[in-house]
């Protein structure tokens, strides 16, 4: 569904809308329940990441407070970020990690064809989890050397240390490849 002037529920597709607190906007929840009842849907399985699991939690709690027991809400975790609590490897992470590793291996080949010194910085998705950025070292599995530096959002980032490290590496080689987590913050 998408929130425009009023909520419009679609029968397929994706959703990037966070449900509001039911005390503020119970209409959203009632619209979902009406839709499920209209099509005789008694089990709602929502596949996704943190925001999707938040929706599952809110809808499930709302159904419980209303005493609605004929509709079941199930959350199936899937996120490339690999940051869902209670899971070791989230569905979606493995293929994304492989893609990141392959991309860095190919990027390395591209970076080393020139004699000119260059620094390539790649920001890797993952919000507040550095799993995908760490997966950039999978480039090594196929004979590449992988990124020269990997900066994870879980580790404090110092711009001074970063610049010193890059400068030193550029004195050793012509190309420097860096993987940086999307959630890295300057300290």
Residue spans for each PLM region:
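Phosphate/nucleotide-donor binding subsite
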Residues: 6, 10-30
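Gly-rich Lys/Arg/Thr-decorated short loops/hinges at beta-loop-alpha junctions or inter-strand turns
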Residues: 10-18, 78-88, 115-118
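Catalytic or ion-translocation cores adjacent to nucleophile or general acid/base/metal-coordination motifs
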Residues: 6, 75-79, 95-101
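Short acidic/polar active-site loop segments enriched in Thr and Asp
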Residues: 42
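Single conserved hydrophobic/aromatic residue that forms the stacking wall/gate
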Residues: 1-9, 187
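Short, well-structured alpha-helical segments in soluble
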Residues: 28-39
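Accessory alpha-helical/coil subdomains and C-terminal extensions
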Residues: 35, 46-48, 54-66, 70, ...
């Amino acid at each position: 569904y998408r929130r425009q002037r009023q909520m419009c529920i679609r029968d397929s597709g994706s959703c990037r809308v966070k449900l509001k607190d039911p005390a503020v906007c119970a209409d959203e929840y009632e619209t979902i329940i009406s839709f499920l009842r209209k099509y005789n849907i008694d089990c709602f399985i929502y596949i996704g990441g943190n925001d999707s699991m938040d929706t599952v939690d809110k809808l499930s709690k709302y159904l419980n407070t209303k005493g609605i027991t004929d509709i079941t809400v199930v959350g199936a975790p899937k996120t490339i970020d690999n940051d869902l609590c209670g899971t070791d490897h989230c569905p979606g992470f493995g293929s994304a990690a492989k893609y990141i590793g392959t991309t860095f291996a190919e990027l390395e080949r591209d970076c080393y064809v020139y004699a000119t010194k260059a620094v390539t910085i790649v920001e890797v998705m993952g919000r507040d989890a550095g799993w995908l950025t760490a997966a950039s070292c999978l480039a090594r599995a196929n004979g590449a050397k992988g990124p020269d530096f990997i900066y994870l959002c879980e580790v404090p980032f110092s711009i001074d240390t970063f610049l010193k490290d890059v400068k030193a590496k550029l004195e050793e080689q012509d190309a420097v490849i860096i993987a940086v987590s999307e959630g890295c913050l300057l300290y």
